[in-house]
Amino acid sequence: MSQLDTTTPSGDYLMALDAGTGSVRAVIFDLNGNQIAAGQAEWLHLPVPDVPGSMEFDLTTNWQLTCQCIRQALHLAKLPASAIRAVAACSMREGIVLYDRSGTPIWACANVDARASREVSELKELHNNGFELEVYQCSGQTLALSAMPRLLWLAHYRPDIYRQAGTLTMISDWLANMLSGELAVDPSNAGTTGMLDLVTRNWQPNLLEMAGLRADILSPVKETGTLLGHVTAKAAQECGLLAGTPVVMGGGDVQLGCLGLGVVHAGQTAVLGGTFWQQVVNLPQPIIDPNMNTRINPHVIPGMVQAESISFFTGLTMRWFRDAFCAEEKLLAQRLGIDTYSLLEDMAARVPAGAYGVMPIFSDVMRFKSWYHAAPSFINLSLDPEKCNKATLFRALEENAAIVSACNLAQIAEFSGVKASSVVFAGGGAKGKLWSQILADVTGVPVKVPVVKEATALGCAIAAGVGVGLYEALDKTGERLVRWEREYIPNTEHKALYQAAKTNWQAVYTDQLGLVDCGLTTSLWKAPGL
């Protein structure tokens, strides 16, 4: 339980359903933002046989797991279902669900489903190779992970499903539909389909028409924090919530995470450190990157958009390093009763800033239009075991994650004019005290770490509360409920060192991309259609 406040004015509670890439959670909060209990279940998104790149979302099993989590959360909280005043859902973005004309879900895919690589290439050729730019100028998205190539794939290979489709939503909206029977999308999540206008925050049907796709499958758009419907008797029997409980529009996981962190005003900046790292900047008005390096998403705050860059597999890289090379440290940490990452950070803290020049090659900065990475490697190693060892490599990985984040924030500042004056650092990465200090040193601005680091569910609960009048507004509530654990001030002595390290890394990374281009090495990840 995260302790923000020990007093609750009433016995009212809110539930957030958080459908992530690797798991689903049902989280109960009191009205002061304290997490009371959570039920969690891992889920898998398996490939379809003989469909390369596919990542199917199992609608039947995943609803059963969601119901299991809801019941588990209520049990752990020792609360009756009547104590839940409202529920809202959030999810990974990009994942879509199709329904037939009676409203029954018939097909879904998860966020990084890459089956439509050929269709991405096909769509890029439209309008003398200008269609992707048109999509980006309208929606802030490129085609790689958008919905249109996936719909075109269905038209090509599963015309039975394509013909049956009556409505399209996101995965968060599917959860809300399973609870309430109502169908709608919110701008923050639906914006990642590449079919929503950043300015109007509504669908742009002509984009589908230009792609030769049906434009009659677009569901109503409702803003985050508005009432959608109520838990049906059928859903109540399945999940354990009380029939009639209000169901409120949720949204995309990153945007609701920013709400839970109080990142609700223009100019505010967050770095969300999970499996992927997102660098998010609130923009004063909808603008796009003329170089198409950065995605632009609708925020859950009406009228606001966010520039978002993504570092690939940052958290996954740290886990790989821990599991592949640090068996001794894992055993020692277990004996000491501490987290292995904490032990590795203690070791890395004794390594000088700059990690003796070791350069990790993993994620590139974000280049949304042509998005791929070099082959994973370490460059500039030494044979001196005093200088090149596990502690050095671990520090180098933490420094590199901060360097990539700083490069992404610089790209955003270049086209938007918005330069971060401070950074909110959240997610699992923010648990690292050394990592937080390194991020401050590399970016050159103060880094604030919140008490609640996994803030997506809290933001979702805030939306639920606003929808039933328990909170006044999204932005004011997000600001009021966030609590700060600590702040890190940049060490100016490290500024020149990290600037040089960043310049050197950028040059070396460019050379490493050349090896991928020549077919000599294998990219860490490559977007569909490249």
From Swiss-Prot:
Ordered alphabetically, the record's keywords are: Cytoplasm, Kinase, Transferase
Q: Which GO terms describe its molecular function?
A: autoinducer-2 kinase activity
* Record-linked InterPro entries: AI-2_kinase, ATPase_NBD, Carb_kinase_FGGY, FGGY_C, FGGY_Carb_Kinase, FGGY_N
Q: Name the enzyme's class.
A: transferase
Q: Which domain of life is it from?
A: Bacteria
PANTHER family in the cross-refs = AUTOINDUCER-2 KINASE, SUGAR KINASE
Family to which this protein belongs: Belongs to the FGGY kinase family.
Q: Which protein is depicted?
A: Autoinducer-2 kinase
Which organism's genome codes for this protein? Answer: Yersinia pestis (strain Pestoides F)
**Phylogenetic lineage:** Bacteria, Pseudomonadati, Pseudomonadota, Gammaproteobacteria, Enterobacterales
